[in-house]
Design a protein with these regions (language model features):
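Conserved phosphate-binding loops in N-terminal lobes of ATP-dependent enzymes
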Residues: 42-149, 295, 302, 327-330, ...
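Gly/charged contiguous loops adjacent to phosphate- or pyrophosphate-bearing nucleotide/cofactor binding elements
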Residues: 77-80, 87-94, 102, 112, ...
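Conserved helicase motor "Helicase C" RecA-like lobe of SF1/SF2 P-loop NTPases
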Residues: 161-165, 388-402
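Hydrophobic, small-residue-rich alpha-helical packing segments that form membrane-like cores
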Residues: 132, 152, 162-215, 221-222, ...
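Gly/Thr-rich phosphate-binding beta-strand-loop-beta motif of the actin/hexokinase/Hsp70
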Residues: 1-24, 79, 195-240, 540-562
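Acidic low-complexity intrinsically disordered segments
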Residues: 235, 316-350, 354-355, 430-577
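Early-domain small/polar-rich strand-loop-helix modules and first-structured segments
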Residues: 1-100, 238, 244-250, 256-259, ...
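Glycine-rich phosphate-binding/hydrolytic loop that grips phosphoryl groups
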Residues: 178-198, 255-260, 350, 354, ...
Length: 577
């Protein structure tokens, strides 16, 4: 079982062997020998690529960042550029002044992110496969189950792009060999084993578990996304997803805010900063990577400055005016850029209110949608950004009296370890459907309700209504995972020798027609059932039964021609239009 936490800033991987009859993998091994990484220090490789002409990959991960300066990446006229954070281009968030430059790790306006994702995952897959075979020489590729995590904020389209990119990168296409897990699901799986640590002076070092907790919320705080999923826990310890939502925010947006609010003014304003991006792009990258390392020092009551290393490669390009101003404000220190404690907090404060608002909204939804004796509710922080003491403090103060805030013991690796546990034994029993899903049918026409333009008279004289929406599941319903919904359909005309199903979705809970505003086809293909072998039967006996089941991140349909028992299984690929 291999778990991959494909993150905006960094990517981690871990594995564990499957043991028959054992419900949990036990010891999980982290991959820590990424190309260009510091052994024993870098748990993750950077989600970065060094590309030439936007097609040829020159380097990936840490190596891409290390080789960028010597390759003149990002310089005027250079065909080479360093990109990272491209995952966020699948669901970009408008941001004032956003560009496709990758400073502080957010290339979130890429035109073709799927190409970059495929290229990066190809190198990850090949590296991990070689590492696994070094430990297990007789291991066959088809004996490995892979689990790649995705943000809960992603919709069907983004998850399908991710699955297609993984397949194109070499991950197996065999059913069940590649799972996609929502990042909060992975964190929740791990927390059930690792336990939690409560936040705040009133809980110094206090540890706890999810045993006895009937409902809780996971706030997965990553580099580019804040994903929230709300759960209840059934009597067997399995998770029932109640609600989920996410936003494009996180640790790397703090970096972007520091650039806009602090560094741009210190280095001479917008125009001057744009000039520096042209003449010293990697020096600015290094400055912000230094901040990435040191921003963990920011606390609610910290007073010390954070000193960012001012390399000569940047200093020599600063204007005289900027150099003099820095010299005067920093007691003559010309080797660093000083960030005051208040300036550092201002970067966090540009991002945290959006997180608090989302948590507040989801906490209200959790209370509205469930009943529980647990008071106050548990809000569990996970992900790399959850290591921020300032974020923990702000959230604890905001929720004081309404919820207890906790973190997982190792926020940086709980998603990847949870991905291994998820692959080993998925514990999500049910999910709340984000959409109403269904298919198009002809139903009996109702005069006074259905428009005459939809009236269809069959060859047998029946008055039918075209374009009716036949529902598989309604938006907001709790849907058991992999438990099929069964529906039976018959042809409209005696001459029909095939039955074609087109699949639709909408946010509307009770849609009547498939052409209602907001209804859309969501699959890349229709499903056609050949009725030739049943044409000798009465019309009612030419029925087709659909078995529709909702998997962890996909919809599966099995159609059966009842007269012969012939099956037409398919996994619906969500449209990436």
């Amino acid at each position: 079982m291999v778990g991959i936490d494909y993150g905006t800033y960094g990517t981690a991987a871990a594995w564990a062997p499957f043991k028959q009859g054992q419900p949990d993998p036990g010891r999980i091994t982290l991959f820590e020998q990424w190309p260009g990484s510091r052994i024993g220090v870098d748990v993750k490789t950077m989600t970065a690529l060094l590309v030439k002409d936007d097609r040829e990959i020159l380097a990936w991960g840490h190596s891409a960042v290390q080789q960028a300066p010597s390759s003149r990446a990002g310089r005027p006229g250079s065909p080479v550029r360093l990109v990272h954070g491209f995952k966020m281009s699948l669901a970009p968030r408008p941001y004032p002044g956003a560009t496709s430059h990758s400073e502080i790790g957010l290339a979130d306006n890429e035109a073709h992110p799927e190409r970059l994702i495929t290229g990066f995952l190809r190198h990850v897959y090949q590296t991990l496969l070689a590492e696994l075979r070094a430990h297990l020489p007789d291991l066959e590729e088809n004996e490995i189950r892979w689990c790649v995590t995705v943000p809960a904020m992603w919709g069907d389209r983004e998850k399908q792009i991710m699955r297609d990119a993984a397949h194109a990168a070499g991950f197996p296409r065999t059913e069940g060999c590649l799972l996609l897990a929502l990042e909060p699901d992975a964190a929740a799986h791990n927390a059930q084993v690792s336990g939690v640590q409560y936040v705040g002076a009133e809980h110094p070092g206090r540890r706890g578990s999810l045993d006895g907790v009937s409902r809780f919320m996971v706030v997965d705080c990553g580099g580019g996304t804040i994903d929230i999923t709300c759960y209840t826990i059934d009597g067997n310890g399995y998770l029932v997803e109640i609600d989920r939502e996410g936003i494009a925010q996180g640790s790397l947006y703090v970096n972007r805010a520091l650039r806009d609010l602090v560094l741009v003014p210190k280095l001479g304003g917008q125009e001057e900063y744009r000039r520096l991006e042209q003449v010293a792009p990697h020096a600015l990258e290094e400055l912000l990577r230094d901040w990435e390392i040191k921003k963990g020092r920011v606390t609610p009551d910290s007073t010390d400055h954070i000193w960012l290393d001012l390399k000569m490669s940047l200093a020599k390009h600063l204007s005289d005016e900027v150099t003099e101003r820095l010299d005067a404000s920093q007691d003559g220190d010309d080797e660093n850029i000083w960030i005051t404690a208040d300036e550092a907090r201002s970067a966090f404060d540009a991002v945290i209110p959006d997180i608090l608002e989302l948590v507040d909204r989801k906490l209200a939804d959790l209370t509205r949608l469930t009943t529980a004796a647990d008071k106050p509710d548990l809000v569990l922080l996970a992900g790399g950004f959850a290591q921020s003491r300032y974020l923990r403090h702000r959230l604890r103060e905001y929720l004081r009296g309404r919820a207890v805030v906790a973190v997982t013991p190792q926020p940086q690796v709980d998603v990847v370890e949870g991905a291994v546990r998820f692959a080993y034994n998925p514990k999500v029993r049910a999910r709340r459907s984000q959409y109403t899903y269904g298919t198009e049918i002809c139903a009996p026409f109702e005069h006074g309700t259905d428009p005459l333009g939809k009236l269809y008279r069959s060859g047998m004289g029946k008055e039918l209504c075209r374009d009716r929406f036949d529902v598989f599941v309604n938006a907001g319903d709790i849907v058991p995972v992999d438990k099929p919904t069964v529906l039976e359909f018959v042809p409209v005309e005696r001459t029909d020798d095939a039955m074609t199903f087109t699949f639709y979705r909408t946010k509307e809970r009770e849609p009547r027609y498939v052409d209602n505003e907001g209804c859309e086809e969501f699959a890349t293909c229709d499903l056609t059932i050949d009725l030739t072998e049943a044409m000798h039967l009465e019309l009612e006996k030419r029925s087709v039964t659909l078995h529709v089941s909702f998997g962890e991140t996909e919809l599966r349909v099995r159609a059966v021609l009842d007269a012969t028992g012939e099956e037409y299984p398919t996994t619906l690929k969500f449209s990436t239009r």
